[in-house]
Each structure stands twice: as structure tokens, then as C-alpha cells.
A protein has these predicted regions:
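An active-site-proximal structural segment forming one wall of the substrate-binding cleft
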Residues: 51-54, 87-101, 135-149
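Alpha/beta enzyme core
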Residues: 60-61, 105, 109, 125-184
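Conserved, mostly hydrophobic/aromatic
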Residues: 22, 58, 98, 154
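Hydrophobic faces of well-ordered beta-strands that scaffold small-molecule active sites
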Residues: 19-21, 66-68, 114-116, 154-156, ...
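Substrate-binding cleft and catalytic face of glycoside hydrolase catalytic domains
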Residues: 67-77, 115-126
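Conserved small/polar residues in nucleotide/adenosyl-binding loops
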Residues: 187-189
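Glycine-rich, proline-tolerant flexible connector loops at the mouths of alpha/beta enzymes
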Residues: 38-46, 59-61, 65-90, 151-166
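N-terminal basic, low-complexity leaders that serve as flexible interaction/assembly modules and, when applicable
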Residues: 1-48
Length: 189
């Protein structure tokens, strides 16, 4: 493959495993750039260099995908902490940082894919669906920003409800980008 050429997610999967580093929230907290509580990824605005360094650490550890750290960076979490006006700048900053790192791989290494990210909403309620249309709008706006900033794929992660994961997947599929969903079971075995 010519240097600098980037294969799609499907092309990579057809050749073998694809690694996507996870654990941003806890690692950023461990490094002192986030305190427990609402776990909103303000690091992309307040300490962008720390986020870039973490992406590079994951990249050097073998991650094939640089995932934008927008986990919990949705309208509801921003409303709760009184910073809803920073929602779009936070998301776009995280996406730009991820894109920068994805395009700047070490010499001889295939460029990483950059993933836009959405997560559970904390307000989805399978028994009272009145808030679910708000969640769908939150997913759509985050997907839109990821597309605008040049994401190669989308990842929806840590959904507790299958219905919410399906709503996320529906919004993600409208982008035309390859999409991956992860679901966290609340049933303890």
C-alpha cells in the first residue's frame, strides 16, 4: 500500500483485527485533567495538549483508530454543568484534535481512522419516552459535527438500553459513515 493511503474500516476488518483504544475518561481523570462527578470532557477546550498527548499515547500503543473524546459531551451533560453554550466548541475541538493525530502517524505506519463518538444520554427512559426525541436530536447534532470535521467512522458507546443504542445507530447511519455500537449490560451475572 502506498505511504499515506488510508484503508476504510471494512478493508481493515477484512484483513484482520482493528484496534480502537478506549478509556479516555478514566485516563484523563488519572492524569489530573478531569474530576469525578459529571465527567464532561472539558479537556478538549481547557487542556487540548493533554488530550492530544493521550491520543498519541494510544496511537503509539497500537490503536488503529483515533476516537474523538466526546463521551458525555452532549447537550444534557453540558446543561447540567451550566455550560451548554460550549457544547459545539467542545465537540469540534475534540474532533479536530483527533483528526490531527489520526493524520500524523509515525513514518511507515498507515494513517489512523478518525472516529466521531456519541454516548448514552443519561436521560433515555424506556418507560417514559417523553425525553427520547430530545435524545435523538442530541445524537443527530453530534453526528453532524463529526461528519463536518471529517470523521471516517462513528462509534456509539456504552448504551444501557438497546432502544437508545438503536436510536443512536439510526442517527449514525444517516451520515453514510461506517458505524459501530457498544452496549453495556446492566445485568450482573
Amino acid at each position: 500500500m502506498p505511504e499515506g493511503k488510508k484503508r476504510s474500516l471494512i478493508e481493515r476488518l477484512n484483513k484482520g483485527p482493528v484496534i480502537c483504544a478506549e478509556g479516555f475518561l478514566f485516563e484523563i481523570e488519572r492524569r489530573g485533567y478531569m474530576s469525578s462527578g459529571e465527567f464532561v470532557p472539558m479537556v478538549s477546550l481547557e487542556h487540548p495538549e493533554a488530550l492530544e498527548n493521550l491520543h498519541r499515547d494510544f496511537q503509539h500503543a497500537g490503536s488503529d483508530i483515533v476516537q474523538a473524546f466526546t463521551y458525555n459531551g452532549h447537550r444534557e451533560k453540558m446543561r447540567v454543568i451550566g455550560k451548554e453554550e460550549l457544547l459545539e466548541p467542545l465537540n469540534r475541538s475534540a474532533l479536530k484534535i483527533a483528526k490531527k493525530v489520526a493524520l500524523d502517524t509515525p513514518k511507515g505506519i498507515e494513517p489512523n481512522l478518525m472516529a466521531g463518538n456519541i454516548s448514552n444520554s443519561n436521560i433515555w427512559n424506556d418507560k417514559d419516552t417523553s425525553s427520547n426525541s430530545e435524545v435523538e436530536k442530541m445524537f443527530s447534532e453530534m453526528v453532524g459535527w463529526a461528519v463536518d470535521e471529517g470523521a471516517d467512522i462513528l462509534i456509539g458507546e456504552t448504551f444501557y438500553y438497546a432502544e437508545e443504542a438503536y436510536a443512536a445507530l439510526k442517527a449514525m447511519k444517516q451520515s453514510g459513515l461506517p458505524s459501530v455500537i457498544t452496549i453495556l449490560s446492566l445485568i450482573h451475572i
